Amino acid sequence: MNYAFTNGIILDGTRDMKPQTNLCILVQDGKIKDIVPDTTDLHDYKIVDLHGHYILPGLINMHVHLAGSGKPQKKQRDNEKLVNTIMSSSLTRTIAYKMVAGFAKDELLGGVTTIRTVGGLGSFDTRLRDEIQAGTKTGPRILASNQGISVPGGHMAGSVAVAASSISDALAHLEQSEKEKVNLIKLMITGGVLDAKEKGVPGELKMPPEMVRAICEKAHADGYLVAA
């Protein structure tokens, strides 16, 4: 189906963009073909009248944890204990997966059409990515990392990242991630904000440099990019 989006205010996403009117966006096979004057003959297109609403390119969120809604926490919680409870039974895993799918759909409804996940529950992210691609779930395009790699006591260790005690542990998780067909590898190299218990921990180096190097070298050799 070919679509023509008319009667809208276009924001084209460029650095110096200005609202544009009296134009029409032509879409063929799910891709933008052209932006033309609204006087163009549109008989080959299904017209979508925007009634003066804004239209802009889909946004991209490069740092997403689908295990949470993104809303501020009212108080600090034991994420490792919470995740262990969630993943301990098929019932709680099913409920959690529905929540994850809902959070992804919220991103899409907010105008975010592509997300990159950087630490999640088990292999939920790749599963959801594949279901969205298959059309059985509604959501944005997902570049998925599944669980990240951290170290004992490190950022998100035991929740949305595994705690690797050694280089061999880290490489074993890397191998598992590749089997899950992730799009990228996520490392938790420094202390984070949400689970910090002391001032100064966020940004503090936690993962040994030799572990970082070993993971990156193996991931790159296998064709994966690494986020940290």
Task: Describe the function of each predicted region.
Residues 1-42, 55-56:
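N-terminal metal-binding scaffold of metallo-dependent hydrolase/deaminase domains
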Residues 8, 25, 30, 52, ...:
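Divalent metal-coordination and catalytic microenvironments
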Residues 54-131:
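Metal-associated gating/positioning segment near the N- to mid-region
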Residues 68-96, 146, 151-157, 192-208:
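Active-site gating loops and adjacent loop-to-helix segments of metal-dependent hydrolytic enzymes
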Residues 89-90, 100-125, 139-150, 182-196, ...:
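Divalent metal-dependent hydrolysis catalytic cores, especially in the metallo-beta-lactamase
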Residues 96-104, 165-177:
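Short, acidic/polar
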Residues 118-161, 168-173:
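Mid-domain alpha/beta scaffold segments of enzyme catalytic cores
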Residues 127, 169-188, 192-228:
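Histidine/acidic residue-rich metal-binding segments in metalloenzymes
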